[in-house]
Amino acid sequence: MSASGLPFDDFRELIRNLPGPDLGAERAVREREATLTKPAGSLGRMEDIVAWLAAWTGKRTPQINRPLVAVFAGNHGVTAKNITPFPPSVTAQMVENFAAGGAAINQICIANDLGLKVFDLALEHPTGDITEEPAMDERTCAATMAFGMEAIAGGTDLLCIGEMGIGNTTIAAAIALALFGGTAEDWVGPGTGSTGELLQRKLAAVRQAVALHQAHLQDPLEVLSRLGGREIAAMAGAILAARMEKIPVIVDGFVASAAAAVLYAANPEAIDHCLFGHVSAEPGHRKLLEKMGKQPLLDMGMRLGEGTGAALAASIVKAAALCHSGMATFEQAGISGSK
């Protein structure tokens, strides 16, 4: 905690003073790309990805040796409003499934040689029901962000962030509405299958929550504490920690992007080291990416969470780095360049 004793002060200071990109490393990558055995620009966005890796790792030949998927799990008091077809107990059951290797994210990590860590965030203690009270007080929220910063402990050179939490698309929609305005209908989607009356209750919950806390939503970190979830606060912390340690980040779907959006609202440059792995089928996600000016890497109609979209995108990032470092130059291969 800062000397002032206010829980968020250290994070506000951090967000104001983030390290920038290494433009020299980015330039070196662009220069090497021009010499590789391919027409200029023919690898399309893969070339931009390598330049992004160089800028945020500071390495002129970026390599991905220890990629990690970090999945944060949290429960939400707002589920008491009967907004989702699944009970909150499913969150803990899915954490057990991750540990047993039985989830989709386990298979994608195996297929792409990615590490996996799962962080259980006090599942037995849901956050406050945001339609009646703040999700967290500032001290709890700040402590959870600090916990999320530990995701990079042990070392990684590419961090993919994802989540698990019954009810958390409601939370993401409330955050998006508070940060970017519009109507609840702009941001609320079916999530894990909320239709009919469930969807109407979900819409009502988002409206009620934002109206209840409206006087306290001018500061993005207060938006996080009042409307957020533990997994969302932890993901925000992980994104910040990665920035400080020169670790590029791949963000997963709607809920993970809501964590990034809090940082973006505080400082638009705070997520420049983030690549958005995919656009979810959850309708609010595309709008949220547009608000932040971010282009997703994949569009596959996915809406599972768990970091699955980020993990699939990591395979492309790994391939981009290998193409850059492993391809021969025209001179090395004895191939004539363009006239």
From Swiss-Prot:
The active site is at 306 (proton acceptor). Keywords: Cobalamin biosynthesis, Glycosyltransferase, Transferase. InterPro entries: Nict_dMeBzImd_PRibTrfase (IPR003200), Nict_dMeBzImd_PRibTrfase_bact (IPR017846), Nict_dMeBzImd_PRibTrfase_N (IPR023195), Nict_dMeBzImd_PRibTrfase_sf (IPR036087). SUPFAM superfamilies: Nicotinate mononucleotide:5,6-dimethylbenzimidazole phosphoribosyltransferase (CobT) (SSF52733). Pfam families: DBI_PRT. Signal peptide: none annotated. The keyword Glycosyltransferase applies. GO terms for molecular function: nicotinate-nucleotide-dimethylbenzimidazole phosphoribosyltransferase activity. The keyword Glycosyltransferase applies. It is an enzyme of class 2 (transferase). It catalyses: 5,6-dimethylbenzimidazole + nicotinate beta-D-ribonucleotide = alpha-ribazole 5'-phosphate + nicotinate + H(+). Its EC number is 2.4.2.21. GO terms for biological process: cobalamin biosynthetic process. It comes from the Bacteria. Pathway: Nucleoside biosynthesis; alpha-ribazole biosynthesis; alpha-ribazole from 5,6-dimethylbenzimidazole: step 1/2. Catalyzes the synthesis of alpha-ribazole-5'-phosphate from nicotinate mononucleotide (NAMN) and 5,6-dimethylbenzimidazole (DMB). Belongs to the CobT family. NCBIfam families: cobT_DBIPRT, PRK00105.1. This is Nicotinate-nucleotide--dimethylbenzimidazole phosphoribosyltransferase. The lineage of its organism: Bacteria, Pseudomonadati, Pseudomonadota, Alphaproteobacteria, Hyphomicrobiales. The gene is cobT.
